[in-house]
């Protein structure tokens, strides 16, 4: 279920400790040309707003469950969000900084091509659910180079660098949103930190990629998107 409403209004309707996983991709602050990324007069105002929805996400998240926040380091704003907002949430523990790497798009002749986006993982408490066997990937080598070591038949656990070149598993929906994320990577997050029937929340659901991933993995999705055009697209996808 995706609602066409403001994220704080949506979160206010959720009870404490009722969500199993939060995965969200907030506005970056003056990175994308769209109006939704340029609605704050200053970085300070933007971070104050981030603190409000982050606090609400922590409130609704169950203990020992995870919060994932997508971002970009094209500017220092995402770093300040980590240091001045997430790190100041007393219940939350930093766990990982994941990189989504890709190889499409233009190049500059003046610097190395920047081809990645960032993903912060925090848990509510030191312990958290992590179902490693659900997200294993094939080994590159067929046999271990170490003597007496057998490779896991299910594959290896991914590193914190996730290469993935296409935005979605369906070309039909590629490009529906300027900051769209690959459904396959969202499925990985969901499988790692939830069980079937658990509740997954995305408060900036865009064109609905997280909702699609939740549906494909038999989870309950709850989310919102304030932009009516993107909300309508997400409804079509589902």
Give the predicted meaning of each segment.
Residues 1-224, 228-233:
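Core catalytic lobe of class I
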């Amino acid at each position: 279920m995706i609602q066409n409403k403001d994220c704080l209004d949506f979160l206010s309707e959720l009870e404490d400790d009722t969500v199993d996983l939060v995965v969200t991709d907030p506005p970056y602050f003056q990175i994308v040309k769209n109006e939704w990324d340029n609605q704050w007069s200053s970085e300070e105002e933007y971070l104050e707003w981030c603190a409000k929805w982050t606090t609400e996400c922590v409130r609704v998240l169950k203990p020992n469950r995870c919060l994932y926040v997508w971002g970009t380091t094209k500017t220092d704003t995402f770093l300040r969000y980590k240091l001045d907002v997430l790190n100041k949430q007393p219940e939350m523990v930093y766990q990982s900084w994941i990189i989504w790497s890709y190889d499409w798009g233009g190049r500059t002749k003046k610097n190395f091509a920047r081809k990645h986006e960032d993903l912060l993982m925090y848990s509510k408490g030191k312990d958290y659910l992590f179902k490693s066997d659900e997200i294993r990937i094939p080994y590159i080598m067929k046999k271990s180079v170490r003597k007496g070591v057998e490779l896991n038949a299910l594959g290896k656990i991914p590193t914190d660098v996730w290469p993935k070149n296409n935005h979605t598993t369906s070309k039909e929906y590629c490009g529906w949103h300027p900051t769209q994320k690959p459904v396959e990577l969202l499925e990985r997050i969901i499988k790692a930190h939830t069980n079937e029937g658990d509740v997954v929340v995305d408060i900036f659901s865009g064109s609905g990629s997280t909702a699609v991933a939740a549906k494909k993995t038999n989870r309950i999705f709850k989310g919102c998107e304030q932009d009516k055009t993107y909300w309508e697209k997400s409804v079509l996808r589902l």
